[in-house]
């Protein structure tokens, strides 16, 4: 990954790094699966693999994190080398990164986290909440990719 350092010393990914991860030079398609259970999630991943895609995001759209974690464990066990990112619905990295680090310690590797809200305030000079999230990520040691949304739906109005 490029040596370019961003806020809080986090390395900034360059386009070439992203393409290297997915072993392609063009657009990368990463479907999102709204998880219901292990079996349907596995069937959806099988369709994704059959289509030649390299990964997916899983989201717990209608249930909490505690019920989602066993699904993640089962899916990672079934697809140990498939690229998997997750979204814990409405959860920032502040809470998610320690959970992901714990999963990693137990052998459940999650490749990326997508947060709907990265807690960036475009009207502020300092980004205390985003910096706290970055510090939490560093402190817990989770090394996956982080996709953090800004001005995402259902958040505060943007000027």
Residue ranges of each PLM-predicted region?
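Conserved anion-binding
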Residues: 95-158
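Conserved beta-strand edge residues that scaffold enzyme active sites
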Residues: 62-63, 91, 119
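Flavin-dependent oxidoreductase catalytic cores
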Residues: 30, 54-55, 66-78, 87, ...
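Conserved N-terminal beta1-alpha1 strand-loop-helix module at the mouth
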Residues: 3-78, 82-83
């Amino acid at each position: 990954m490029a040596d370019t350092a961003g806020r809080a010393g986090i390395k900034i990914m360059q386009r070439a790094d992203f393409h290297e991860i997915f072993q392609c030079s063009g657009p990368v398609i990463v479907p999102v699966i709204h998880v219901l259970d292990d079996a349907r999630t596995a069937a959806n991943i099988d369709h994704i693999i059959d289509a030649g895609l390299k990964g997916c995001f899983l989201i717990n759209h209608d249930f909490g994190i505690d019920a989602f974690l066993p699904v993640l464990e089962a899916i990672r066990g079934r697809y140990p080398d498939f690229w998997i990112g997750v979204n814990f619905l409405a959860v920032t990295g502040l809470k998610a990164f320690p959970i992901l680090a714990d999963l990693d310690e137990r052998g459940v590797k999650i490749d990326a986290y997508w947060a709907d809200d990265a807690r960036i305030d475009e009207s502020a000079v300092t980004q205390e909440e985003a910096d706290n999230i970055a510090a939490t990520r560093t402190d817990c040691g989770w090394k996956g990719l982080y996709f953090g949304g800004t001005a995402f739906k259902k958040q505060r109005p943007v000027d």
